[in-house]
Amino acid sequence: MDVIKKKHWWQSDALKWSVLGLLGLLVGYLVVLMYAQGEYLFAITTLILSSAGLYIFANRKAYAWRYVYPGMAGMGLFVLFPLVCTIAIAFTNYSSTNQLTFERAQEVLLDRSWQAGKTYNFGLYPAGDEWQLALSDGETGKNYLSDAFKFGGEQKLQLKETTAQPEGERANLRVITQNRQALSDITAILPDGNKVMMSSLRQFSGTQPLYTLDGDGTLTNNQSGVKYRPNNQIGFYQSITADGNWGDEKLSPGYTVTTGWKNFTRVFTDEGIQKPFLAIFVWTVVFSLITVFLTVAVGMVLACLVQWEALRGKAVYRVLLILPYAVPSFISILIFKGLFNQSFGEINMMLSALFGVKPAWFSDPTTARTMLIIVNTWLGYPYMMILCMGLLKAIPDDLYEASAMDGAGLFQNFFKITLPLLIKPLTPLMIASFAFNFNNFVLIQLLTNGGPDRLGTTTPAGYTDLLVNYTYRIAFEGGGGQDFGLAAAIATLIFLLVGALAIVNLKATRMKFD
């Protein structure tokens, strides 16, 4: 007799389809909101990932994909999506001055106004639960008063000329400041038909739009008469001369346009960018190679020492040597920054007492780079030591016994047996370490902040900057504005360089991907 298993309420198909339906509606609502806000890339990504997830968890035939989907969705969202966005930005002029769309930039310019008429002093007087607006003309001495009104939204107030003083006490500056936004939405209409709006905390003035949009898309400055035309090569409204050529004046804010390969060509053709870029690239490669070599060398030697059978107290030494790995790196970096202080650091005090020298760790390029390598070796050797300690356990003791019978010494054992057997399994990890140090942003940012700075460069660059720090400084610390497009182009080049170097390393060591 077959036993029919009773399903719990949370296992019912009705509940499953109800939850999936609600999630589908929520996702659809979010996608529509993103699309309405102009965030097309986010909307498409959300739609693809959510639709795939709903299909996989609703379809029994796709049951096996339920174990793979979270990882693939995470990789797509946190790896591929930022990569695609970065590459897309690299082909635009996106920067602190060119962030808006053309339509939004045009709207901002058309919203600007200029003072084109008389200025009137104004006062705000209570009228029960409402207010009255009073204007006075300082030239003619005429006074104008509105009917009672309440704050809220855009409104037009018809003012009448009066000789009587409004009742009640005039509102102080605090009340006006609190209601400044509401007062800015008020248009006061004088008896002669002129319109005035709030221009300061105590004045209403006649205002007119600063720019007028012509039928051919040209903006005309109503104050100066200068005409501006959108220049899609640079992403700005730019003035035009009488003969139709481009003038020197540009209107901010600008708008985002596609510039093609311009940002990439700037890296290789602009000497102010090319020279620091190439120098920083060479230093980044050298820094990564030296760091990998020293961390592996120090870690391997220390692993061999703490695995030495004749050594007493090996457990204590292991714990002490692994401590730098247990302490968060940013804490160690800041501690070293204090130790290397040129005036009061303990390292310079010790060197001065012993040898009479005080290296300029933060102002001299060579010593600053040396300091970085020392600190990074300190931070990285425990990881390599732990790996080597585990790999040493896999080396058979018979090999060392056979070499001892042949009369091999300590160094021969290390270079002929230990090193060859360790270096092969360590190679993939060394490549990963190289890629990590190639983009070791935190070390540079916390210890030297890229300094000392290079002189004569178009973009901010330092002697200890890695490519990733150089990109960050261009994007967020540029003196001439934040150039996200150029930074994205350099980030794309970094991605290609790291990928190419990793492939070259794998090919050189003849490592098989499987």
From Swiss-Prot:
UniProt xrefs under InterPro entries: MalF_N (IPR035277), MalF_N_TM (IPR048464), MalF_P2 (IPR029345), MalF_P2_sf (IPR047103), MetI-like (IPR000515), MetI-like_sf (IPR035906)
GO biological process: maltodextrin transmembrane transport
Annotated membrane topology: Multi-pass membrane protein
Domain ABC transmembrane type-1: 281-505
Acetylation as UniProt keyword: no
Sequence intervals crossing the membrane: 14-34, 38-58, 71-91, 277-297, 320-340, 372-392, 417-437, 484-504
Keywords, comma-separated and alphabetical: Cell inner membrane, Cell membrane, Membrane, Sugar transport, Transmembrane, Transmembrane helix, Transport
Annotated localization: Cell inner membrane
Database matches in SUPFAM superfamilies: MalF N-terminal region-like, MetI-like
Domain of life: Bacteria
Function according to Swiss-Prot or TrEMBL: Part of the ABC transporter complex MalEFGK involved in maltose/maltodextrin import. Probably responsible for the translocation of the substrate across the membrane.
Oligomeric and partner information: The complex is composed of two ATP-binding proteins (MalK), two transmembrane proteins (MalG and MalF) and a solute-binding protein (MalE).
Listed name of the protein: Maltose/maltodextrin transport system permease protein MalF
Annotated source species: Shigella flexneri
Gene transcribed to yield this protein: malF
